[in-house]
UniProtKB/Swiss-Prot annotation:
This is Ribose 1,5-bisphosphate phosphokinase PhnN. Catalyzes the phosphorylation of ribose 1,5-bisphosphate to 5-phospho-D-ribosyl alpha-1-diphosphate (PRPP). Pathway: Metabolic intermediate biosynthesis; 5-phospho-alpha-D-ribose 1-diphosphate biosynthesis; 5-phospho-alpha-D-ribose 1-diphosphate from D-ribose 5-phosphate (route II): step 3/3. The lineage of its organism: Bacteria, Pseudomonadati, Pseudomonadota, Gammaproteobacteria, Enterobacterales. It holds the Pfam family AAA_18. Transmembrane segments: none annotated. It catalyses: alpha-D-ribose 1,5-bisphosphate + ATP = 5-phospho-alpha-D-ribose 1-diphosphate + ADP. It comes from the Bacteria. It is an enzyme of class 2 (transferase). HAMAP family: PhnN (MF_00836). The gene is phnN. PANTHER family: GUANYLATE KINASE-RELATED, RIBOSE 1,5-BISPHOSPHATE PHOSPHOKINASE PHNN.
Amino acid sequence: MARLIWLTGPSGSGKDSLLDALRAAPPPRLLIAHRYITRAADAGGENHVALTETEFDRRAALGLFAVSWEAHGFRYGIGCETEQWLLRGQNVVVNGSRLHLAQAQARFGSQLLPVCLQVTPAVLAARLRQRGREDEAEIARRLARAAQPQPDGCLILNNDGALAETVCQLRQILELHQ
């Protein structure tokens, strides 16, 4: 059975780096889904399809998102094309949201494989400061949010160390859960 890997983790945990590493050397039968976001394409961060609020509303009204949510002042959508990829036997990794995991579970059922990327608070704080997008108050809020318990059934993947180690661990998880 093809799986939808719902990758979550706090901002700064390394989700984008992990997805970039998978894109560079993808395992067989694995696709990395892009997200539709109401954020400029050149805003930095992940490779995504930038939509205006109006475009996002129109696509949502047409049922073109399998899952969508709002966070940090932006709207995010995972396109229905991911369901076609799954039907064709491809595993799909998406940059998901732990707060919207239940919505993804309702849509994808047993095909969903939630993976939660974690880093220690000290590493997370250092990464957030290094990227320079948040002030100290926002960093404190993100650290508090990251300290909340992970959802039940989420496989934990630590990313404190070298990215290559995390990629290797994720590949092992994918092999075990096919």
